[in-house]
Amino acid sequence: CLCRDGEILKNVPPLGYVLGDEGSGAVLGRNLVNGIFKGHIPLKEEFLAAHGLNYEEIIRRVYREGMANRFLASFTRFVARHIDRPELDELVCEAFRAFVRRNLAHYPADAEVSALGGVACHFERQLRHVLATEGMRAGRIVETPDEGLLNYHIWNRSE
């Protein structure tokens, strides 16, 4: 959302992991599974062994159990462990690029982009790279809301 002086001026809805949520852990996990099973990411055996899963189990967990978004988001740790692989670096950059183009493009180009959450923190290098290549200025990237609120009050306190 676009905020100024603590007030939300504009908000593009995320729409959840099925309809949107570009750049989220669920989308990274979904794209990872897609890339692995469609042969674009050559880490299938390692991925399945690391999670004790097979194709049928993944399909069952995604389509027949609740919280598929959390299940898919759990695979971001695998992405983080293998981020040195060009395929996974690009997977993350593509997700952030989609986020920027579908969400941030609706805000003023000169707005500083700050981010909150584990995905932004763990893939900060990729996020900053995408923001720069899309002509945007990166601000603070923090993992937890508490850290963000604390920094806000530290940097904006009146003395």
Predicted segment positions?
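Phosphate-binding/catalytic loop of phosphoryl-transfer enzymes
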Residues: 1-45
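ATP-binding/phosphotransfer module of carbohydrate and carboxylate kinases, centering on a glycine-rich
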Residues: 33-159
